[in-house]
Amino acid sequence: MARKSLIQRERKRQKLEQKYHLIRRSSKKEISKVPSLSDKWEIHGKLQSSPRNSAPTRLHRRCFLTGRPGANYRYFGLSGHILREMVHACLLPGATRSSW
């Protein structure tokens, strides 16, 4: 299980990303439309003044049960070893174990 502080940090990043999403998107569109370089630098400076954690690249997918950051299946939102345990316990409908 991941430390609670890491999970809270990730939630804080998600909230910041949602808050600044429209601002960042509109700034990027402005940069592509403005022809002069000096205006682009001004808009870029405004974009750089937004919080670092508001960038979507700072987000990381985590298992919603354990908070584990690696080996996540997007469809289930679970990490690999939790997914395997749940499939073996028949807790995920429609998921079957592979056997050959």
Swiss-Prot record:
Q: What family does this belong to?
A: Belongs to the universal ribosomal protein uS14 family.
**One of the record's GO molecular function terms:** rRNA binding
> Main location per UniProt?
plastid
Q: Name one GO cellular component term.
A: chloroplast
Kindly provide the name given to this protein in its UniProt entry: Small ribosomal subunit protein uS14c
Keyword terms: Chloroplast, Plastid, Ribonucleoprotein, Ribosomal protein, RNA-binding, rRNA-binding
Q: Name one GO biological process term.
A: translation
Give the matching SUPFAM superfamilies.
Glucocorticoid receptor-like (DNA-binding domain)
Going by the entry's taxonomy, the superkingdom of the source organism is recorded as Eukaryota
For this protein, the record's NCBIfam families field holds: PRK08881.1
> How does the record describe its quaternary structure?
Part of the 30S ribosomal subunit.
Q: Which InterPro entries does the protein's record reference?
A: Ribosomal_uS14 (IPR001209), Ribosomal_uS14_bac/plastid (IPR023036), Ribosomal_uS14_CS (IPR018271)
Q: Which organism is it from?
A: Vitis vinifera (Grape)
Gene symbol?
Answer: rps14
